[in-house]
């Protein structure tokens, strides 16, 4: 009898980040009875906008790229405005073995890797592009010899095998900046899969109005979640960590029972899980997941990043002709960006400490030691005013229980992509899968999260039409 009373949802979505909330948003517009269960005490997942005075800073994901149609359309629908990331002026390059620090204008028509002394990278990129032409990333196959061979090598190993050992330092930096993992911690196949999902290398190397970090949302990226939550109203709940998903037979159909850590039970016909792969190990599934999905949850890892936000009382770097962007092989900040709000109510620079070993090293230091190292690095680039911020903020995403890191799930060398990747989005009974890690487009980005939600909504709508099972 209890089952009859509680069986009142078409679909329950686990996770109140961008993919989960947009899944709920689209299903509710189609008159589905839905519920979002979020484990945290806030919505937004790996986006988190923090109020600072009259403005904000984004402690999590914050950028839209030019080729992010789904996210841009959603912002338009939610009446959210965007503004351009500030790139006018010189970028600092701290990448030279002799310790010299140079600056270049990336908007110059003549700017390229050769100008900054990295011309030796161009042949490697061309070689990688040739390799990518022979891979069908839409069908990661255990029958593909090239995929199997590439996946057995880390990025560093592949470079050395191919005779590009002198470029390991650059690609180690590149991997940290793009997927928050070192070139020793991910397979070359995973890196190529990621690069393919964002339409190639070019937009990662040079920052301009067409790059992957071209636009920001006024009010912060969390505004997307806030607007959707205001639409969903009581159809989303916080502090509901899911511990059990049990598919049971009921009246000749499959009923799903969801149990949370506070012993609440919910019943529905469909579940959408947006939990990152490596966190699925915290949930009991009945019946158990197929072996391929079990391998994904047990073997995938999350990238590691500390996002550092330094707030100042002036935009002194702009006044000196700099754009706040830096690229460093030295650290502790390996990449930084101007992080000012559109109205300059908050004047700040964000920086990233990325990679497993880097996080381990810098988090063994005190907060004051990290702060001092970051400010001293910035003072080398933009002068003594960098030593006197009005606020210093850190977010170590590796310490976040419900993210376990950032920016995205990554794959080490082995065979997990070629053996298991095609299984990740396949429904398990009436359990469907979304989240940026399930997206073949803009993997790891906010756009990837929205794209995955579009896919899973189409799955559920199609199933509903076939079975006429909507409540």
Swiss-Prot record:
It catalyses: a secondary aliphatic amine + O2 + H2O = a primary amine + an aldehyde + H2O2. The keyword GTP-binding does not apply. Disulfide bonds: none annotated. The modification S-8alpha-FAD cysteine is found at residue 406. GO terms for molecular function: monoamine oxidase activity. The keyword Transport does not apply. Keywords: FAD, Flavoprotein, Oxidoreductase. Pfam families: Amino_oxidase (PF01593). Its cofactor is FAD. InterPro entries: Amino_oxidase, FAD/NAD-bd_sf, Flavin_amine_oxidase, Flavin_MAO. Its EC number is 1.4.3.4. PANTHER family: AMINE OXIDASE, FLAVIN-CONTAINING MONOAMINE OXIDASE B-RELATED. Belongs to the flavin monoamine oxidase family. This is Probable flavin-containing monoamine oxidase B. It comes from Dictyostelium discoideum (Social amoeba).
